[in-house]
Amino acid sequence: VAPSVPAVRSIGVLPALYRLLLGTQVNRTRLAALGGLGMAAILVGFAIGRSDPVDPLVTGAAFINSFGLSVTVPVTTLVFASAALGDLTDDNTLVYLWVRPVRRWVVVVAAFLAAVTVTVPLVVVPLVLAAFLTGGGRDLVTGTVLASGLGVITYAGLFTALGLRVRRALVWGLLYILIWEGFVARGGDNAARLAVRSVTATILASWSGADLRLAVLAPRTAYIAPFVVVGLALLYATRRLNRQDVA
């Protein structure tokens, strides 16, 4: 149980917390398994380029959207972001951070930044390389950078909060990705707008000109929405951490 009036420290402790949480997320099993998704994307991108498609831009965009933005980005980000604070909650060690005289938002931001740091090289880099190898050109590469990067940030905010909200956050996150984004969101534009995938698909479609599933947002909205979602998710996580009993 937390002290009734915890002391607080400044943002100066953020780097130390960031390094601590980064270390808890990185292990060989996760890196090998999720790095495999990136390698698969690179190999398929190379195969598409070698097949000499009629329209490399559209073909490449369809692949990046269906595999990269629909599987690689959300699943990889889920594994690391949900674990950032979720693992500590599940094994009852979050209390060791909770009783420290540190502002709760600093803990949440450190967890979010740690998740993004691990995920970006595992997701954005291989997807950009895959986009390049398809032969789709500069527009496809640029669209992939923006869509995958903003996708990682958005999912990281949501899944960091999810890790605090529920136990077994990985399972709940997979249900969201597979059921809501994979099926329900395809039932209509209103449902699609509640899926992060609509943001990434819209950004990629705006650069590639391809007709992509779930690309239902206005481009301006697709660029603004990630920052709104992340802000709200981290605010919720901070409030949750302030109120919950972790011991």
Sequence positions of predicted segments:
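Aromatic- and glycine-rich beta-strand/loop motifs that create alpha-glucan
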Residues: 2-35
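Short hydrophobic, aromatic-rich alpha-helical segments embedded in or entering the lipid bilayer
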Residues: 13-16, 189-212
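A generic "structured core" feature
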Residues: 25, 65, 108-110, 238, ...
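Short coil/turn motifs that cap or connect alpha-helices
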Residues: 30, 103-104
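Secretory targeting signals
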Residues: 35-87, 91, 108-176, 185, ...
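Short helix-to-coil transition segments within interhelical loops
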Residues: 96-103
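Alpha-helical transmembrane segments of multi-pass membrane transporters/translocases
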Residues: 209-247
